Amino acid sequence: MSEEKEMTFEEAMKQLESIVEKLEEGNVPLEDAIAFFQEGMKLSKLCHDKLQHVEKQLEYMLREDGELVPFSPEEA
């Protein structure tokens, strides 16, 4: 059986923002703060990886002949 459906970027950001809010309150027990921090780091990496993937996709545009070419902002 496959693992849970992969979290979207938006879902990960929302969860990360929630963790940051909890940690900023300052009344979180140390053990919970460490667990929140670890989860936040995982979510941060997930978001970073998704952004890198999108960035790589945007580096290329499809020509009329179907050939992928690097995107140049000057051509836009």
From Swiss-Prot:
Q: What is its main location?
A: cytoplasm
Task: Note the superkingdom of the native organism.
Answer: Bacteria
* Keyword Manganese appears in the UniProt entry: no
Recorded GO CC terms: cytosol; exodeoxyribonuclease VII complex
Task: Give compartment(s).
Answer: Cytoplasm
Q: Please state the Enzyme Commission number of this protein.
A: 3.1.11.6
List this protein's GO terms for biological process. DNA catabolic process
Provide the alphabetized UniProt keywords: Cytoplasm, Exonuclease, Hydrolase, Nuclease
Swiss-Prot/TrEMBL catalytic activity: Exonucleolytic cleavage in either 5'- to 3'- or 3'- to 5'-direction to yield nucleoside 5'-phosphates
Q: What is a single Pfam family found in this protein's UniProt entry?
A: Exonuc_VII_S
UniProt xrefs under InterPro entries: Exonuc_VII_S (IPR003761), Exonuc_VII_ssu_sf (IPR037004)
Which molecular function GO terms apply here? exodeoxyribonuclease VII activity
How does this polypeptide assemble, per the annotation? Heterooligomer composed of large and small subunits.
Q: What does this protein do?
A: Bidirectionally degrades single-stranded DNA into large acid-insoluble oligonucleotides, which are then degraded further into small acid-soluble oligonucleotides.
**Which NCBIfam families is this protein grouped with?**
PRK00977.1-2, PRK14063.1, xseB
Q: Which family does it belong to?
A: Belongs to the XseB family.
| Name of the molecule in the record | Exodeoxyribonuclease 7 small subunit
From which organism does this entry originate?
A: Geobacillus thermodenitrificans (strain NG80-2)
What would be the name of the gene that encodes this protein? xseB
